[in-house]
Amino acid sequence: MTANITFKEYLKSFFYILEPFNRYRKTYENFFHVMSCVSKQKFPINAILKNGEKKVLKNYYETYLTSFQIMNDYRIDGTVISISKSDMPKTKIDFGNNNGDIYAVFFEEIYKFLPVQDQIIIDIGANIGDSSIYFSIRGAKKVIALEPLPKNHSLAESNIKNNHLENKIDLFLGGCSNSNGHIFVDPEKEGAGSSTNHSNQKLKVPLKTLDTILKENNFEPTLLKLDCEGCEYDTILSSSEETLKNFSHIQIEYHYGYKNLKQKLESCGFDVSVTKPNFIRNKQAGKTMFFGYIFAKRL
């Protein structure tokens, strides 16, 4: 498991366990109470900010965003967040059962590495459609989005429609792998980290290789984003240099270390940088993960 990162990175990755604690401690005066309520899913929470301001936190996402000092530019009604940042069109996202990553996508803008303006991008692991919608409102000409979990796919479909982006985003129920075929997924599973291994529930979802996805489209994508909770290894490591060189930029959220992915991309003519791995025990997938980002630019 640790062979895909250095031993030093392995040791340092465990400090990430403290990140939520430190973030909440810096934001909330009564952070123990806030964290206790979050862990028990007891909302609303009567929070006291470090500046003395009292704030009623109605749900998890409001608590989460506030912990990053994000107090404005959004409104949450039930499970729908309306984002009204000055530099982008007003956007509404239904996050369902706390799915997607609204903070990273729309506020941290983790995908700003990808020059999406007037480009075509493949979004593997579209989740609730948050990343695909972000690419579209940042100027992408077309987004080809794949999501294998039916509940996430349904939310993504609704979010795309509610933001009037049906003509810019082509959404498919499916995943990416090292061979064409299918998997059986639990139709009730949702959220980041949900396993897509064989399940007792018999819902058949197609898998396609990256090369197949490229051949099935009548246009040439130039950008690739992968956040598929492990499929990045089968997808990238099995793809030929010819296939990968279709893309000028590739961004990957890796989940089990990065070294083999970095070596593969560099051998195919990409300049590659990575963020340090962070440790997480993903309860939904039942796995230990060392995750971070890979940024690859074709030379």
Language-model regions, residue ranges each:
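Phosphate/nucleotide-binding beta-alpha loop and adjacent structural elements of enzyme active sites
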Residues: 1-299
